[in-house]
Amino acid sequence: MGKPAAERRLSENEAQAFARLIRSSPRKLNLVAQLIRGKAAGEALALLTFSKRRVAGEVKKVLQSAIANAENNHQLDVDRLYVSHATVGRALVMKRFHARARGRGARVEKWFSNLTVVVRERADEPVQEAAE
């Protein structure tokens, strides 16, 4: 548990953004993160905009922040960005008590999650000329 032994270093064509303590379970948040993994940044934003899941708004904010970091801090071309990593991790769990019948009680767990989004600039693909 805890942090990995070696932190992941970003290359020159990458930018990232974090969100800590998102009020959603990691399992539900990962469903939305799977939607955007490997997609172009514009396409991922469109998917999140029209997603019916409540947590999609939080993921969209983090993705927009990663895109802004790429543009302003790393001078990357926004049109060539894609989501290379979207990582979901467990954060704290709040324990609550729910009163039940006959003097009993039930434990309610309110899960929190962390989200990391890394965007990468696509490399220039060599243009192949048609052989005549």
Swiss-Prot record:
Kindly indicate where the leader peptide sits in this chain: none
Which residue pairs form cystines in this protein?
Answer: none
Q: Which Gene Ontology MF annotations are present?
A: rRNA binding; structural constituent of ribosome
Do you know which InterPro entries this protein is assigned to? Ribosomal_uL22, Ribosomal_uL22_bac/chlpt-type, Ribosomal_uL22_bac/org-type, Ribosomal_uL22_CS, Ribosomal_uL22_sf
List the keywords (alphabetical): Ribonucleoprotein, Ribosomal protein, RNA-binding, rRNA-binding
Q: Which GO terms describe its biological process?
A: translation
**Which superkingdom heads the taxonomic lineage of this protein's source?**
Bacteria
GO cellular component assignments:
cytosolic large ribosomal subunit
* Gene3D superfamilies registered for this protein in UniProt: Ribosomal protein L22/L17 (3.90.470.10)
Q: Which SUPFAM superfamilies match?
A: Ribosomal protein L22
- What PROSITE patterns does the annotation carry? RIBOSOMAL_L22
Entry keyword Oxidoreductase: no
Give the matching CDD domains: Ribosomal_L22
The family line of this record is: Belongs to the universal ribosomal protein uL22 family.
The annotated subunit structure for this chain is: Part of the 50S ribosomal subunit.
What this chain does, per the entry, is described as: This protein binds specifically to 23S rRNA; its binding is stimulated by other ribosomal proteins, e.g. L4, L17, and L20. It is important during the early stages of 50S assembly. It makes multiple contacts with different domains of the 23S rRNA in the assembled 50S subunit and ribosome.
Descriptive protein name = Large ribosomal subunit protein uL22
